[in-house]
Amino acid sequence: MKHNGSRTCLNRRSRFGSRERDWLREDVKRGCVYLYGADTTTATTTTSSSSSSSSSSDLHLVLCTVETPASEICAGEGRESLYLQLHGDLVRRLEPSERPLQIVYDYLSRLGFEDPVRIQEEATNPDLSCMIRFYGEKPCQMDHLDRILLSGIYNVRKGKTQLHKWAERLVVLCGTCLIVSSVKDCQTGKMHILPLVGGKIEEVKRRQHSLAFSSAGAQAQTYHVSFETLAEYQRWQRQASKVVSQRMSTVDLSCYSLEEVPEHLFYSQDITYLNLRHNFMQLERPGGLDTLHKFSQLKGLNLSHNKLGLFPVLLCEISTLTELSLSCNGFHDLPSQIGKLLNLQTLSLDGNGLTALPDELGNLRQLTSLGISFNDFRHIPEVLEKLTMLDKVAMAGNRLEVLNLGALTRMSQVKHVDLRMNHLKTVITENMEGNKHITHMDLRDNQLTDLDLSSLCSLEQLHCERNQLRELTLSGFSLRTLYASWNRLTAVNVYPVPSLLTSLELSQNLLECVPDWACEAKKLEILDISHNLLTEVPMRILSSLSLRKLMVGHNHIHVLPALVEHIPLEVLDIQHNTLSRLPDTLFSKALNLRYLNASANSLESLPSACAGEESLSVLQLLYLTSNLLTDQCIPVLVGHPHLRVLHLANNQLQTFPASKLNKLEQLEELNLSGNKLTAIPTTIANCKRLHTLVAHANNISIFPEILQLPQIQFVDLSCNDLTEILIPEALPATLQDLDLTGNTNLVLEHKTLDMFSHITALKIDQKPLPATDSAVTSTFWSHGLAEMAGQRNKLCVSALAMDNFAEGVGAVYGMFDGDRNEELPRLLQCTMADVLLEEVQHSTNDTVFMTNTFLVSHRKLGMAGQKLGSSALLCYIRPDTADPTSSFSLTVANVGMCQAVLCRGGKPVPLSKVFSLEHDPEEAQRVKDQKAIITEDNKVNGVTCCTRLLGCTYLYPWILPKPHIASTPLTIQDELLILGNKALWEHLSYLEAVNAVRHVQDPLAAAKKLCTLAQSYGCQDNVGAMVVYLNIGEEGCTCEMNGLTLPGPVGFASTAALKDTPKPTTPSSSSGIASEFSSEMSTSEVSSEVGSTASDEHNTVGLEASLLPRPERRCSLHPASSAGVFQRQPSCATFSSNQSDNGLDSDDDQPVEGVITNGSRVEVEVDIHCCRGREPESSPPLPKNSSNACSEERARGAGFGIRRQNSVNSGILLPANRDKMELQKSPSTSCLYGKKLSNGSIVPLEDSLNLIEVATEAPKRKTGYFAAPTQLEPEDQFVVPRDLEEEVKEQMKQHQEGRPEPEPRGEERTEPLEEFDTAL
């Protein structure tokens, strides 16, 4: 069999044969390449393996090895060339010597896969085509072609008069010109060129689908063109309108995968700026870069990101160039001919491998801006001293270790110097001569310990954040702005006093006092000196007549000085200090104060808002969370009639006087959570502008009158004592989120739920099942989740919580933050647990299965993950098999900026790594080595500050999905686990978060408290927090038979009988041991929508894997039996998200008990993943004395009941001795596979597993699934008529007499009834 170059066509019914699988297994260097055909109707930017428009004949499977070159595959396929597309983006031609399979293997290896066998398996997965794909022909997208060139044979008439006749001519619109041939369908004759820039395009009314093209100028020419169809007319009008509207002759051909300049573009001789960035331009070929000199008026040329490798020397012949960009092309040197570009003013060479510049560069006397950032320079090139007009030098991301100020002094005209992200450790001053021309300097992210720039007497702005500075010395003659945060500064010296200074940022340092010179700065408007060691605020600072914004939070300030005179202060942040009171004259003297944050202090009272009868306060935002305020402070708030935001959470409020709340008419957001309030005043109805009310964790028993407010949007009354809701006849249309969880006594009728049908998010508790019917839940952990949108209009944070996972003794918790997108967090929320469940059965090594879980989830994002990205955090608790002294181990993996913190013995233990450029120097260096461009706002290519994410595949190899992994055994000292997104940890320290929730009994209230604290401390973004309470005892046994006394030969079959029981040969659909080699792949799998795998169940396992029984985990007290049993393992998951529009719509219309589908979406806690007990697949018939034997077993405490899995909400119990033949008729036992839905999702057929699908039958909302109580309609209850009562009692009596003896009570029964959730 010939494998290299052989072709196998895959269609929706053909399969990956056993012969091919056997051949692949023989050597890991063998594999297959999916070869796609070109389809001009399919967009290259959105193509994927899920593209339904690609016919089966366009997809071929080529078996090859890592040594097979592209030329050999082309020969076998009858192709001229192969093309490679990465991440649905650009398409480049492969060189004949390149090896496609090796390219795939290298790609997977760089993503994070290490095992060669796993790399071979992943390479055969058709879903990979969303990230890397091969074409036999170059694909073209029609709208791309339209923007490059429009052509066709149309009826044309020259001139505005009707003297000329209509004639068919070849018409081309390319670049800035309209080209009309003199002969029909011929380009060899004379071509008439009509420049369109500055001209006009008009509709010809007398002729249908006709346009009049006119050039600019006094002697303008006009051509009338008649099109055959409306679509052609619109295409030409749209493209021509862009050309005529330009002021300059600019042509943008970026991101078109071009290898050469279109031939007709050379007719546009008036082009002044040509953009060819992000293409694959060739040097020597017709239309290549060597022909660009034909544009005689070209002034600007952008050739960045073309992977040229060598500098195009012929570009130096274009003497008219004033702007040239050649960034990210892999240059290692520049030719001497570059000195010919005498008119060049701007030269960008960023992202290459340059180590030196030629001396001829000094000839460019007109050069004003030079960009050589992210190269390999170790010193400032001397040739720059010859550039007398040079104004800006950008050398960020190089390898400079020493900064010689003398070299900068010799550059007489340089004003802006960018040296951030180098390796600077020392600054050398050659002489005392001052430098009078440098005004802006950026030294961020270096390794400086001391910095003396006093010789730069004209310095206006300095950035030196994130160094290791202990002392900073500057000249104050011209200083206007200073940014020196995130250092170790103990002294900042500026002389003379900076009279022009307007902004000063010194946060995150070790300063013990405000510098004296700062107190004397007469124009200082902004001062941020938070996160230092201050003990006081100087009177001169607080009484400054120029200061408008003062940030002194997170210090040790005990008291603020009293104000004597009026001050212009507008923003005051004094949070996290030790203040017991505020100055009495604060509000009366600071009449411009609009924002005050005094949270996390020890305030017991507030100063009066006015000295006289009338208040002049303009205060709008007031944050007083976590103080010692009582009811006595409420009357003072009335003096601030313009308050819009008021936070009084976590104080000691017991009442809120109705008369006082009535006067806060401008109030828009009110947070009263964490107090001791029993009611919200009825006068809240007068706050007509109120849109947010947060009052969780109080003692409120009466629902406030907030549903009459016209603008109310968000209401959080969770963790209170509500018993009922009084709602008006009509609810406000603006209401989006109503949280009533944690109100254990609250019962909502169906009529009430119907009235909330329009609410995006209705959060209520699920009605608990009776104690005798409830399933066995974990006593080792419980969780609470809170998510708040903040000031943004959508929630881009989702969470995953499974208290019972896999075998029922594990748990999985996750947090996903999409920053600005909400799609990816929801996809990860729905898929990642399934991927983990599959991966833990492939490997027991935590590093391996966690890494593979993230990488596979990255792949499953499909097209959605090409341009979007998300931070991800996953925590997996499982039995610890490696450490016999520990019951459970915790494995945490993360990418991005979501973090997990473990509270151990009252102290925080961080388990995550922050993958950002600012916090991880190693990752920043990796990104720099890959020659990425890091913009001044510290973002990779201006997109994200994270270096590792799930998604954002188009930023490969700079952004990777490989996670950081940490494992630790859980001990009795581990109290809780906190998961939070970026916004949470930006505003709360690890220690404060742990201390805030350690003594909160309810995990839901704890999570809510963390989010409230973050918002009160200044967070305006989405914030998400999950708190997992741990109860890991030393006596905890984690084996599968813990707490279960095995029944004797009556309760279950005997051991001998079990040995004879045949093992199941049908694999479980949830066992997760899926392989591309052991399972059959069809084209339907290849063509399935990768982006719609949000609810995919685990793949069908191979036959070989299914025959291997999984050994049961037992301890020495509960030895394993000699016979294995089989059971499908669902899980119990609680999903929380902000929208259910994630591809999970179900085809099943069967109603489910306990789920209210009244038009609004509700959150439902469902069992879909974990098993809580085991059951034999079959057992022999019971002996005749089975009833007596069962009674004896119950007397010994070994009795138990099995709850039907397909009646999880009804709580029906089946006795263990029920006839098995009846059970086998259940769909949940007779079918082990899932049901294929129309969207490609796989769901099992059990009712309990369809709960999540039924929940999504509700109209699509923005906030996911929420817990709804299970309530029976009154008419559904069983009612016995009076005339039949006696007859029914007699029948029940006879039925009881026919039953076995009841179980003994009291001391005879020592153990409670055990109950297990099984697949039955």
Curated annotation (Swiss-Prot):
Cofactor details (free text): Binds 2 manganese ions per subunit. Mn(2+) is inhibitory below pH 8 and activating above pH 8.
Membrane-topology descriptor: Peripheral membrane protein
Keyword DNA-binding: no
Start and end residues of each PH domain: 147-245
Keyword Membrane found: yes
Family annotation (SUPFAM superfamilies): L domain-like (SSF52058), PH domain-like (SSF50729), PP2C-like (SSF81606)
Region span, Disordered: 1057-1100, 1265-1320
Enzyme class: hydrolase
Residues annotated for Mn(2+) 1 binding in this entry: D817, G818
Sorted UniProt keywords: Cytoplasm, Hydrolase, Leucine-rich repeat, Manganese, Membrane, Metal-binding, Nucleus, Phosphoprotein, Protein phosphatase, Repeat, Tumor suppressor
Catalytic activity as recorded in UniProt: O-phospho-L-seryl-[protein] + H2O = L-seryl-[protein] + phosphate; O-phospho-L-threonyl-[protein] + H2O = L-threonyl-[protein] + phosphate
Source superkingdom: Eukaryota
Compositionally biased intervals (Low complexity): 1066-1094
Described purpose of this protein according to its UniProt entry: Protein phosphatase involved in regulation of Akt and PKC signaling. Mediates dephosphorylation in the C-terminal domain hydrophobic motif of members of the AGC Ser/Thr protein kinase family; specifically acts on 'Ser-473' of AKT1, 'Ser-660' of PRKCB isoform beta-II and 'Ser-657' of PRKCA. Akt regulates the balance between cell survival and apoptosis through a cascade that primarily alters the function of transcription factors that regulate pro- and antiapoptotic genes. Dephosphorylation of 'Ser-473' of Akt triggers apoptosis and decreases cell proliferation.
Protein name, per record: PH domain leucine-rich repeat-containing protein phosphatase 2
Organism in which the protein naturally occurs: Mus musculus (Mouse)
Gene: Phlpp2
